Every structure is written in structure tokens, then in C-alpha cells.
Amino acid sequence: MSMLCYTLIIAFLIGIWAAPKSEDNVPLGSPATSDLSDTSCAQTHEALKTSRNTDQRHPAPKKAEDQELGSAANIIVDPKLFQKRRFQSPRVLFSTQPPPLSRDEQSVEFLENEDALNRNIRSKRENHPVNDHGEYSVCDSVSVWVNKTTATDIKGKPVTVMVDVNLNNHVYKQYFFETKCKNPNPVPSGCRGIDSRHWNSYCTTTQSFVKALTKEGNQASWRFIRIDTACVCVISRKTGNF
């Protein structure tokens, strides 16, 4: 009987000594490691699900190239818009090339190649220099071709001017020949050649109306718009000089 008790006690002590002391000693495939693996997988799945939902709520921004392509879409213009002479103006030019430096006194036209452009560059920009007869301009002006995106129409309302015009699968740019004053006072007293003892004077830019191709929504149409077209001298009599 005593031997049996000793045997049971020794077996009990051996079992206690052989038991694992911590989870670090748990072999792979045991219930403890299985629970850890399941927990890790669940956390990973939840993280992926959260990330996917975030991407759906905040989609990736479009590439800059895509945005530029969308904004560069041109309105196709009916060629019939250019068949009426009353819409033509020598100060409006549609060209695929940069326009000549100065206007060549011609009606609205299309320049499609470099040869046509070179034929129009013969006339250079002039700032009203002294000529052979000793004549001077009262005011100094400068004339250049410009692009316009907005303007004021004949009713005084702002309008959108078409810069790019898609005509017969060719993209033209719309240019305007503007003239403006170089300096409001070409001489210290004001305008050149004005008797400053009796007159006040200064140079100012004036505007006139030309037909331009404008757009409203997706529709293109001709409208009168104001552009700078001249530099004139304004004079007023000095008080007390009668």
C-alpha cells in the first residue's frame, strides 16, 4: 500500500515538472498558437476591409493629363459662320501660327502654314516715328496682336471670347489687333505739338467694336465686342485763358 502511494506521488511530481511553463513553449499547431493565428488573420482581414471602404469613399484623384484633355475640348464651329461678309473685320485673325507683328489691312482670314505667315510679316510694327517730311505724331501708340478670353459686348455685358476654334478638324486661334497709347504724356506738357500755355492735354486709348466669335455654353456665335483701336489726344482749355 505504501509503495503504491509513493508511486502515485512520484508520477504526480514528474507530470508537474514536465508541464509547459509559458505560452512561449507551446509547440506549433497547439490550440494556443491556433488561436493566435486566427486572431492575426481576423485583424488583417478587418484592416483590408477598412482600407477598401476608405478608397471607395475617397477615390484617387484624376491624372493631370486627363484633366487637361477634358478642359481642352474645343467647340466645333460651323463653317457657314464665316461666309457672311458683314462678320469680317481687319482687326480679327484666325491662325494656326503666331500672327504677324502688325496688321496688313486685310479682312478676316485663316493662316494655316508658315509661308502664308511670312507673307504677312512684311509690315512691321511701327511706333509712329519721324518720317521724311519732318512730321510727328501727337501721341505715341503701339499695335500688337493679342488673345482675349473675356470682353465687353455692345450691350455692356461681359462675354466669353473663344480662344481656340475647331473648324474643319483644324484648331485655329482667334487674335485681335489692338492699338493703345504707349505713354499718356509723350512730352512733359502732355501731347506733342500742343501749346501748353493755353491747353491741357494728354493721350488716351479709345475703343471701338469688332465682330468676334464668342461662346455661351456649347454654342458659338458672333458678337460685337470692344477692343483698343486708337490713341488720341484729349485737350481742354486752361482756365483764365480766353
UniProtKB/Swiss-Prot annotation:
It is found in: Secreted. InterPro entries: Cystine-knot_cytokine, Nerve_growth_factor-like, Nerve_growth_factor-rel, Nerve_growth_factor_bsu, Nerve_growth_factor_CS, Venom_nerve_growth_factor. Residues 1-18 form the signal peptide. Residues 48-69 are annotated as: Disordered. Residues 19-125 form a propeptide. SUPFAM superfamilies: Cystine-knot cytokines. Expressed by the venom gland. One of its GO terms (biological process) is negative regulation of neuron apoptotic process. The keyword Signal applies. Disulfide bonds join 139-203, 181-231, 191-233. One of its GO terms (molecular function) is growth factor activity. Keywords: Cleavage on pair of basic residues, Disulfide bond, Glycoprotein, Growth factor, Lipid-binding, Metalloenzyme inhibitor, Metalloprotease inhibitor, Protease inhibitor, Secreted, Signal, Toxin. GO terms for cellular component: axon; dendrite; extracellular space; synaptic vesicle. Residues 48-66 have a biased composition (Basic and acidic residues). SMART domains: NGF. It comes from the Eukaryota. Pfam families: NGF. Glycans are attached at residue 147. Belongs to the NGF-beta family. Nerve growth factor is important for the development and maintenance of the sympathetic and sensory nervous systems. It stimulates division and differentiation of sympathetic and embryonic sensory neurons as well as basal forebrain cholinergic neurons in the brain. Its relevance in the snake venom is not clear. However, it has been shown to inhibit metalloproteinase-dependent proteolysis of platelet glycoprotein Ib alpha, suggesting a metalloproteinase inhibition to prevent metalloprotease autodigestion and/or protection against prey proteases. PANTHER family: BETA-NERVE GROWTH FACTOR, NERVE GROWTH FACTOR NGF -RELATED. Homodimer; non-covalently linked. This is Venom nerve growth factor 3. It comes from Demansia vestigiata.
